[in-house]
């Protein structure tokens, strides 16, 4: 049975959030790390002989242990070549643990149950900042039927790397403090300026544009103390609506108030008609969804006559038709492309 999981986010239009939830401190950011490694111990689900780089990597690894093996003589399918990625947080210290993502490069069928061998993770400057190693489990990434296929060739390993090198920071001596909004918005930038100047009783904040707020630290506070107080302040905030679809698991996450404009879309054999001016009553083949929507399984058609149609309504109706997560993703993308969805669409 094909199943789509739908999560609805219940929220008011405007609510209070802390500044740290909507803005970042410029210069305080994650850094991307990457490395190449081998996963061993796979039960015949590793790379085949067509993945020449894997065979060469095995040979190089063994040669480093004084064991000489010609890559052409290696027939094992218990090893897979992988790329390992991680984020190094700002102010991370030597010995801290990092989560890593391990992704197959070759034709391995699955990484489940394997072990990632010692892998150096480097920054863009080529320096080693972390070392990864550990057991692989892809349990959380098994897709539902009708999904985009197996993703057991990728896995996230919690705490799979140790930080070996710290990135130098001079935050305490930095006199140029700036907030960068995660989503550009003049109203939010203005709210931050107004709240901070009110709290500190002086002109400590100046909104430069829709994304940038310059800060001026009071002389009696350190940078750390000042930013701690700044980031914990509450402001009025209206978030941008968003629809998130996890194509690996077939999960849709959407706010209950994400509206869809009138539109007619056909995808494969599925037709969607959204027309609030159509007062046609349900025919004998249609199922009344009790929310202004009707589903006709005989023709794979859904129509919505309600004045307010939402992503949640459409997702439920598509699920009723038995649409696969692949179909859901394609339809949502087409709705967004047609300008019918008033929200950001994110595929993860």
Curated annotation (Swiss-Prot):
GO terms for molecular function: structural molecule activity. The keyword ATP-binding does not apply. InterPro entries: Flag_FlgI. Keywords: Bacterial flagellum, Periplasm, Signal. It is found in: Periplasm; Bacterial flagellum basal body. One of its GO terms (biological process) is bacterial-type flagellum-dependent cell motility. One of its GO terms (cellular component) is bacterial-type flagellum basal body, distal rod, P ring. Residues 1-16 form the signal peptide. Transmembrane segments: none annotated. The keyword Transport does not apply. Pfam families: FlgI (PF02119). Coiled coil: none annotated. Assembles around the rod to form the L-ring and probably protects the motor/basal body from shearing forces during rotation. The basal body constitutes a major portion of the flagellar organelle and consists of four rings (L,P,S, and M) mounted on a central rod. Belongs to the FlgI family. This is Flagellar P-ring protein. It comes from Campylobacter jejuni subsp. jejuni serotype O:2 (strain ATCC 700819 / NCTC 11168). The gene is flgI.
């Amino acid at each position: 049975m094909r199943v789509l999981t739908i999560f609805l986010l219940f929220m008011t239009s405007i609510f209070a959030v802390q500044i740290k939830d909507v803005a970042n401190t410029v210069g305080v950011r994650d850094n991307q790390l990457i490395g190449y490694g081998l996963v061993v111990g796979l039960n015949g689900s590793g790379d085949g002989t067509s993945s020449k780089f894997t065979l060469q990597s095995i040979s190089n690894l063994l040669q480093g242990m004084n064991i000489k093996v010609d890559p052409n003589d290696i027939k094992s399918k218990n090893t897979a070549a992988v790329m390992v990625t991680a984020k190094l947080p700002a102010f991370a210290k030597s010995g801290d643990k990092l989560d890593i993502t391990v992704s197959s490069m070759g034709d391995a069928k699955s990484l489940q149950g394997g072990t990632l061998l010692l892998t150096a993770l480097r920054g863009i400057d080529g320096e080693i900042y972390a070392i990864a190693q550990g057991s692989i489990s892809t349990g959380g990434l098994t897709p539902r039927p009708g999904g985009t296929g197996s993703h057991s060739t990728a896995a996230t390993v919690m705490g799979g790397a140790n930080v070996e090198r710290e990135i130098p920071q001079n935050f305490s001596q930095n006199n140029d403090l700036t907030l960068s909004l995660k989503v550009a918005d003049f109203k939010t930038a203005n709210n931050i300026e107004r709240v901070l100047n009110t709290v500190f009783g002086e002109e400590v904040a100046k909104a430069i544009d829709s994304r940038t707020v310059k800060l001026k630290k009071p002389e009696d506070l350190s940078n750390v103390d000042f930013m701690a107080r700044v980031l914990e302040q509450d402001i009025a905030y209206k978030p941008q609506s968003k629809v998130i679809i996890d194509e690996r698991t077939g999960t849709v996450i959407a706010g209950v108030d994400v509206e869809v404009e009138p539109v007619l879309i056909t995808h494969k054999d599925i037709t969607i008609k959204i027309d609030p001016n159509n007062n046609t009553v349900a025919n004998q083949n249609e199922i009344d969804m009790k929310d202004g929507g009707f589903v006709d399984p005989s023709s794979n058609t859904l129509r919505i006559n309600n004045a307010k149609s939402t992503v949640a309504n459409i997702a439920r109706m598509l699920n009723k038709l038995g649409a696969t997560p692949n179909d859901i993703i394609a339809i949502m993308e087409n709705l967004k492309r047609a300008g019918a969805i008033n929200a950001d669409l994110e595929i993860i």
